[in-house]
Amino acid sequence: MSTSRNVPNKKNNTKQQKYQQQSQKQFKTVRATGNGEKEPFSLAMSYGHIPVVTASVHLLSSFLLRHLSFISSKEEKVFGSLTVFAAEAADKVSEHRQCLQRLINETMDSNMTSYSADVFNIQENQVKRDNGPTHYSVWYRSGNFAPNSILESNPVTLVDADAFDLIKQLTYRLGKAIFRLHNNGNSSFDIYVKDNLSNFKIYLNNLADHLEKDDIYDNFLDMVESQAKIKKDYYLNNRNLLVDNKSSNRTHHKSGDKSTVKSTDKQVEKKVEESSEKVPEVPKKIVIPKSACKPVVGGVSFAQAAGKSQTANSDTKEDQVTTSTSESTVEVKSLEVKETKEPDEEVFEDLNN
């Protein structure tokens, strides 16, 4: 039984390793040199509008790395030793931030009962994710509350801040945490956290002192300020042009729509009037008079015109006419009646064919 208690639980170890991997991904460090990764320039587009006094510790350190990496990317011919110093400073700031992130992860893993958890303000993560961190540091990740009076006197945003603004706010946050740990931290872990935070604060103060004495950094800030002013003026001018073009296009489209509506209404009215005035023409039926269907005595009948012989009928007619005039008239009438039936059928048959 005693041996089973001493055997480590493999499931718990694997879960702890996965959690550490996820926490390292969440607190992924950013470096300014070629050995690591540079801070993305999209950071300014996303968080540059936030005031420095309300920004989180994570954003303050991120924008400080961004500022130093920007200086280190310049040519040495222009800024001389400042570019080399900025690259070294970016490495040091990145190392101290890695240490700070590691302290927060250790606090969440195994030191939740220490006073450091209260200083870092460790809270449970409300958004549950698969294999994700269950806790996070409000002190490191969330913003800082500042009243309106302080915001009015300190309106500098992250994108416009220089190294002095960022270092001043970082040392202020670190100093408050160190003061609380010094007064209330009793465990060895609290002392360990306090010492690391003190080292980070000391280095930031030394960095600010060096930049303040460097005249090249002042020239760099003047150059950045002039470039920012040029970009701002260019942006405002283009924005005004776009607004003017949009307003003119809107008025043009509105007037054009009204004219087209009026023209279409007039066209519809004309079509209605034309359709009401016009009367559909009904085709007339062709009527053949009955008199045209009767044969002519002594002339050419319709049957003869169609190419049919009437020899038998003509012989009988001649014999009947020579006997007597009275009988011929009667017989001719009878023959007319007989002949009117036959030619009618033949003529209509020919017409149908």
UniProtKB/Swiss-Prot annotation:
Annotated spans, Disordered: 1-24, 245-280, 305-353
- Which residue ranges have biased composition labelled Basic and acidic residues? 254-280
Q: What are the Acidic residues biased-composition ranges?
A: 342-353
Q: Give residue spans, biased composition: Low complexity.
A: 9-24, 321-332
- Its protein name is Uncharacterized protein R616
Q: Which species does this protein come from? A: Acanthamoeba polyphaga mimivirus
